[in-house]
Design a protein with these regions (language model features):
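Membrane-helix boundary connector in multi-pass membrane proteins
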Residues: 226-228, 248-259
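Hydrophobic, membrane-inserted alpha-helices
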Residues: 43-47, 98-105, 157-166, 187-191, ...
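Hydrophobic alpha-helical transmembrane segments in multi-pass integral membrane proteins
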Residues: 103-111, 160-172, 216-232, 271-286
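Transmembrane alpha-helical segments that form the membrane-embedded catalytic/substrate-channel core
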Residues: 74, 192, 243-247
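Cytoplasm-facing juxtamembrane segments at the starts of transmembrane helices
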Residues: 31-38, 85-97, 137-160, 176-183, ...
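Hydrophobic core segments of alpha-helical transmembrane domains in multi-pass membrane proteins
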Residues: 62-71, 118-126, 178-188, 231-242
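Hydrophobic alpha-helical membrane segments
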Residues: 98, 213-214, 233-248
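N-terminal topogenic module of multi-pass integral membrane proteins
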Residues: 1-142, 257-262, 269-286
């Protein structure tokens, strides 16, 4: 009797299949994209527009700059962590936004400038924060495009040039601090570029260190022997940095070709021409 009940209970009616338990898909956090990045950049612009206010002293503006840098950095850390960007704790994701904020704040503290110049600097700051972080975000999602490398190089170069000009034209900074600042700016910007060419932190840091040392040595020579203004020297230093780091990036990436050597070598030739022109002229140009 029991065997009959067991066989009847185990037998299903014809046409009816035994239902399989469905496995629930793993819950994946919603990825954040350009809307979040645009909102973060807009908040940075809104806060940065207050840097030119006459109600703040320079020390208070520096404190506000540090606070804005921390705010933007934490926002980008949350963005990359939520999207599971590879190596989201690496400093190269946050170098350009922080340097851009410092450059915009320094322009805002210039007393002789009209309010439109600091406002334009803050707007450019917001666009650079968005562009540089968008490149990192797209690269982390596997959506890298050829234009992204141009955006990365353009934002890094422009911020580098602005900071070089600010440091060189500052009369309050001692000479030692000027060259130290140039070294740090070139080091961080170079590390940002070299991290795109290699995943090894040591190689990127060593390449950035050599690039920064070369640029700082060139700055010392030009400030000492060239009778030129800060704008002229800043342009030469930025071109020299761009040529050196460009050749090094492609050498690390194993993509160095004759065309690339010609393109970056052209910047080196321009630097040599500008230095020779200043030496021959012997007076400020422009």
């Amino acid at each position: 009797m029991s065997e009959a009940l067991a066989s009847s209970s185990a037998t299903l009616p014809p046409g009816q299949l035994r239902a399989r338990p469905r496995s629930r898909p793993a819950v994946r956090p919603v990825q954040l994209g350009t809307r979040y990045l645009g909102l973060l950049s807009a908040w940075a612009v809104a806060i940065g527009l207050g840097f030119k206010s006459e109600l703040f002293t320079p020390n208070q503006i520096w404190l506000a700059t540090a606070g804005l840098s921390i705010f933007v950095t934490l926002g980008l850390v949350f963005l990359h962590a939520r999207n599971r960007t590879p190596a989201w704790l690496s400093l190269d994701h946050y170098i350009t936004p922080v340097l851009t904020i410092v450059a915009a704040a320094t322009f805002s503290m210039q007393p002789a400038l009209d309010y439109r110049v600091p406002a334009l600097a803050v707007l450019i700051m917001g666009s650079f924060i968005f562009a540089s972080s968008f490149v990192d975000l797209s690269r982390g999602m596997g959506r890298e495009r050829p234009l992204h490398r141009f955006l990365r190089d353009a934002t890094t170069f422009c911020v580098l040039l602005a900071l070089f000009y600010i440091v060189l034209q500052s009369n309050d900074l001692p000479v030692v601090f000027k060259f130290s600042a140039i070294f740090v700016i070139a080091l961080l910007s170079g590390y940002r570029s070299f991290r795109f060419a290699t995943k090894r932190e040591g190689v990127a840091l060593l390449s950035a260190f050599l690039t920064a040392g070369t640029v700082t040595f060139g700055a010392f020579g030009m400030v000492t022997y060239l009778n030129q203004g800060s704008q002229y020297v800043a342009v030469i230093l930025a071109f020299a940095w761009y040529a050196w780091q460009g050749l090094t990036v492609h050498a690390l990436d194993d993509s160095l070709s004759r065309r690339i050597m010609f393109e970056y070598g052209l910047f080196a030739v321009i630097c040599v021409y500008l230095i020779a022109l200043a030496l021959v002229t012997g007076r400020p140009i422009g």
